[in-house]
Amino acid sequence: MPTKCVLDTNVILSAVLSYSGYPAKIFDAVADKSIKIYISEEIVSEYKDVLSREYFKISKDKVGRTINIIRKLGIMIVHEISDFPMKDESDRIFFDAAQSAETWLVTGNVKHYPKKDFIITPAGFCRNFNI
């Protein structure tokens, strides 16, 4: 049974910008279906917005392919909106999705989130699940 998680945008962005490193390993595991990701319309919209920013110089084609993979392989959920204090409100969608799905939140910005056992770095996630 595949491991399940929510991926913060920084993990997706890092995977798209570099084919090496823990974020790339995680995205490869999503593509080969050994990891399932939970997504929502808000999360997919955030991914697309960030990947499309001009200064990252990611082609529209690559953004489209990435979003298509995420939509095709992701588990679409509708999550509750919490009132948990957040350092950055734009991170709430990922926190709330992980809480609602009762799964891991994988992020390179652990410090942006409340201290919770389900929040983990890409390196920690890869070590814990032998990715």
Task: Give the ranges of each region predicted by the language model.
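Residues at secondary-structure transition points
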Residues: 21, 38, 61, 85-92, ...
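Intrinsically disordered, low-complexity and often Lys/Arg-enriched segments
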Residues: 1-3
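Membrane interface segments of multi-pass transport proteins and intramembrane proteases
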Residues: 56-57
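A secondary-structure boundary/capping signal
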Residues: 7-9, 39-40, 109, 121
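Active-site neighborhoods of divalent-metal-dependent phosphate/nucleic-acid chemistry enzymes
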Residues: 71-108
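Acidic, PIN/NYN-like endoribonuclease modules and their adjacent C-terminal/linker elements
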Residues: 92, 103-104, 110-131
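Short, well-structured alpha-helical segments
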Residues: 60-71
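PIN/NYN-family metal-dependent endoribonuclease catalytic core
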Residues: 6-7, 17, 22-52
